[in-house]
């Protein structure tokens, strides 16, 4: 069976990354593509399901996992830990399923060091003006918060060249097509096709 591919997807807040991933999943069978489920020490929010939205663990459990190098990457955010389990990712990839990991550039660097065969995709907004409009469109943040988010977005975007693929989300449908095209091209790579069609190739080349 062909090994699945791990896709690292990064973007500044407001670039449409989460919407694109969710739209992609709706077009892909579950046995082809999944989103990585992270471990976290924060409390579940209403409606969140253990193992579906996150794997909820306590601080001691998380630190024990860190001590045995169980995470591909982990970070502390607002006094809570978040991490991507190496074992969970590898188990899914071994079944031939592609896994999408929604993560920032720092986490992406950690992942690439431990899984150099992962493919990485960066999503850009079409302009700063449009990014500002999208950030303001939420209608919940002060000018100070918006300015901080914009500064964080610029810092995130400065790492775009570290990625394998670049998508500009100007038109959503076009960006989604670009994302699908990347997945299709990766599935047609020689290494994956040789595994997938090993029996056929053997028969075709037999005397």
UniProtKB/Swiss-Prot annotation:
EC number(s) on file: 2.7.4.8
Catalytic activity, as annotated: GMP + ATP = GDP + ADP
Keyword Isomerase among record annotations: no
Top-rank EC class of the record's enzyme: transferase
Alphabetically ordered keywords of this record: ATP-binding, Cytoplasm, Kinase, Nucleotide-binding, Transferase
One GO MF term: ATP binding
Entry-linked SMART domains: GuKc
Signal sequence, renumbered to the chain: none
Residues of the Guanylate kinase-like domain: 4-184
InterPro entries per record: GK/Ca_channel_bsu, Guanylate_kin-like_dom, Guanylate_kinase, Guanylate_kinase_CS, P-loop_NTPase
Cellular component, GO annotation: cytosol
Residues at which ATP binds: 11-18
Gene3D superfamilies given in the database record: Guanylate Kinase phosphate binding domain (3.30.63.10), P-loop containing nucleotide triphosphate hydrolases (3.40.50.300)
Keyword Cytoplasm: yes
Highest taxon listed in the record's lineage: Bacteria
Family under the similarity heading: Belongs to the guanylate kinase family.
Function per UniProt: Essential for recycling GMP and indirectly, cGMP.
Protein name: Guanylate kinase
């Amino acid at each position: 069976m062909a090994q699945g591919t791990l896709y690292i997807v990064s973007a500044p807040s407001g670039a449409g990354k989460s919407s694109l991933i969710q739209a992609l999943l709706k077009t892909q069978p579950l046995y082809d593509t999944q989103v990585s489920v992270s471990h976290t020490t924060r409390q579940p929010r209403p409606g969140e399901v253990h193992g579906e939205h996150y794997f909820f663990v306590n601080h001691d459990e998380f630190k024990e996992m860190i001590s045995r190098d169980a995470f591909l990457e982990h970070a502390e955010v607002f006094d809570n830990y978040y991490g991507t389990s190496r074992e969970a990712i590898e188990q899914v990839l071994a079944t031939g399923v592609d896994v999408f990991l929604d993560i920032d550039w720092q986490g992406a660097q950690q992942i690439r060091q431990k899984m150099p065969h992962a493919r990485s995709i960066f999503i850009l907004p079409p302009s700063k003006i449009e990014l500002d409009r999208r950030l303001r469109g939420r209608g919940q943040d002060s000018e100070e918060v918006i300015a901080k988010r914009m500064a964080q977005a610029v810092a995130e975007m400065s790492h775009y060249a570290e990625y394998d693929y670049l998508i500009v989300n100007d038109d959503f449908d076009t960006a989604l097509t670009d994302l699908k095209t990347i997945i299709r091209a990766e599935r047609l790579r020689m290494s994956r096709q040789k595994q997938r069609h090993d029996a056929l190739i053997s028969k075709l080349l037999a005397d």
